[in-house]
Regions:
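Domain-edge interaction signal
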Residues: 1-313
Length: 313
């Protein structure tokens, strides 16, 4: 062992070893999102398989878990600009094992879980890792439901808004419902799955129901699904910043939680304004549509009366 005190602990060893194993598997660039998500996958495997807790700081955000890299004790990686896409690529630094304060048991178990993670997910893209996380580790069914709705919106032909093809239990393809009907069913399922009296969810319930009603107004007016998808993303972003990262997290420092609290208030206020402005626009459109319908009906009656008069002469 070096005479100097180790610079890093077990959470950092998990992240460093993960980056090394990913690089050994492939020369592909490692994105920030992939790295932070796979740290969580490895940590969960440690806890579930070995009941070993390294103290990794992680939290639920949008469609899956992320490691809070600000809680690492130091930088065991370099993060230069990625080549070919926006963002950073993560590269492990050249370090000796002595730089990490890791027990013998921890070394063996972390190594085992990291190697399992790389075998299972190293060649997967971020979307596949997200899907694994919300299918296997979502803290409640509501998270799964909104994740599935987002996936659904991403698969619809946004230009034609054609009907969805559904599959029966026997695998027979049939088109039973319109997109609108199917989306309304998914919204109903989400409302039924919204957590009751659970953590900070209650703080967002009234705003969530107002958002839900606004989406239904969008469907009434045949708003493009791309806009509905954006509005869903707005909600999931707000829910993540106001509720999820607080209720479903571990080993987050008090100072970081305090920063999150300040941010949550601003995000909730912005989202409230977003919902109000969107509703105002939609209700205005509906009012104008009603007026035009009235004019159209009056015009039709006038034409019918003129036709009747012509027939009588």
């Amino acid at each position: 062992m070096s005479e100097e005190e180790p610079e890093f602990g077990e959470p950092e060893f998990l992240g460093w070893h993960l980056l090394r194993e990913l690089k050994n598997q492939s020369d592909d660039q490692i994105s920030r999102s992939k790295f932070l998500k796979l740290c969580c996958v490895a940590d969960r495997n440690l806890l579930e398989t070995h009941e070993y807790d390294v103290g990794l700081a992680r939290y639920w955000y949008m469609y899956g878990e992320l490691t809070n890299e600000h809680e690492f004790s130091g930088r065991f990686y370099n993060a230069p600009q990625a080549m070919g896409w926006d963002g950073q690529q993560y590269i492990p630094k050249s370090l000796d094992i002595e730089a990490f304060d890791v027990s013998k048991e921890g070394f063996e178990l972390i190594t085992d879980s990291v190697e399992w993670t790389v075998r299972e997910f190293g060649r997967e893209n971020v979307e596949a890792i997200k899907q694994h996380q919300y299918e296997e580790h979502a803290e409640n069914s509501f998270i799964q439901e909104y994740s599935e709705l987002r996936w659904l919106l991403s698969t619809i032909d946004l230009g034609s808004q054609q009907r969805l093809e559904n599959f029966t239990e026997g695998g027979t393809k049939e088109t039973v419902e319109s997109n609108e009907e199917y989306l309304r069913q998914k919204l109903d399922t989400m409302v039924g799955a919204y957590p009751e009296d659970e953590g900070r969810h209650e703080e967002m319930k009234a705003l969530y129901l107002r958002w839900d009603d606004t989406v239904r107004l969008m469907l009434d007016q045949s708003v493009q699904y791309s806009r509905i998808a954006e509005f869903l993303d707005d909600f999931i972003f707000a829910l993540s910043r106001v509720v999820l990262r607080f209720d479903y997290s571990q080993h987050i420092s008090d100072s970081r939680l305090a920063d999150w609290e300040e941010d949550a208030a601003d995000v909730k206020s912005d989202f409230t304004n977003n919902v109000q402005e969107t509703r105002r626009e939609l209700l205005g459109n509906r009012s104008r549509s009603t007026e035009l319908d009235g004019v159209s009906r009056a015009y039709s009656r006038t034409i019918e009366e003129q036709i009747e008069r012509l027939r009588s002469h």
